[in-house]
Amino acid sequence: MKTKPVFVYKGDALAKYNFGDNHPFGPKRHHVFHDELERLSLGALVQITPPSRASIDQLALFHTSSYIDQVSRASEDGKGFLDDGDTPAFLGVFEAASDVVGTTLAAIDAIMHGQARRAFSPIGGLHHARRDKAGGFCVFNDCGVAIHYLRENYNVQRILYVDIDAHHGDGIFYDFEDDADLLFADIHQDGDTLYPGTGASDETGIGNAVNTKINLSLPPGATDNEFSEAWAKVENYLMDNPPEFIILQCGADSLAGDPITQLNLTEAAHRMAALSLCQIADRHCDGRIIGLGGGGYNLDNIAKAWTQVIKAFLVNQKS
């Protein structure tokens, strides 16, 4: 029997990455997505795959040893915060965050070994964590680890990172700001109106990496029309910048009704972006793309947005 070309990751280890019932990043996000996947009869079309755990050496591809140690210690007593007040410590946070990273790396392995054409992890895309600190509900930055992992393990150098979460992907942008081989495209709510307050249009990279990054901010209340205009700029940018691998951070907090953001997109924006990137992946890098769930704090929106990404990943699939 042929291996199904789209891997989707599922397991209690992923669901354990949450900050409790009273926190926006709560415990139901993982299950809501998988319930919707089954309701739409998509579960039978993908290969449901268990999570994996990252090693300390893998975490250290991006994070400092002192920060890894800090999270490990906080995980033992589960008290306090890992940042200035957004990201609480909890018992087992080190293991839970390591499972997020390990699952993203497993998705890369599945694609690079030819087991999968696309892959999606709902609890991933923790784009605010920096090399030496947590931020914005993000403990370890699986995207940052993934970029180094691709380079060190598969000699994949020219990587495209696309972020359509309502929040700017500061943990990737600033830690790869001078990296000319990290192509970066981010559509987000205007940083003057939303955490982390970054991602201005004139931030295009520094040094040899100038013009390898594109930041496109949307005003509060922006709809699919404004997103489509921004996405056309992303596609134009990518015409001259073919990648070897694509990472899509597809946060669902850009949809109308999210409790902590103010954009008014629909899930059609996620489908459009995912379809476009799949076409680019098929054209330039043998279809290699992973999707990471990112943010999203309205459970209905999570279910709608992420399943649209899966539908896009299933279009014109090849074995």
What are these regions (language model features)?
Residues M1-A60:
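N-terminal low-complexity, Ser/Thr- and acidic-residue-enriched intrinsically disordered segments
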Residues K2-Y9, A15, D69-S319:
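A general "terminal functional-core" signal
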Residues K28, V32, A54, F62-S66, ...:
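Generic alpha-helix structural propensity
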Residues S41-G43, Y67, H113:
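Short amphipathic alpha-helical segments with coiled-coil-like heptad repeat character
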Residues S52-E76:
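Charged, often glycine-rich, active-site loop that binds/positions anionic groups
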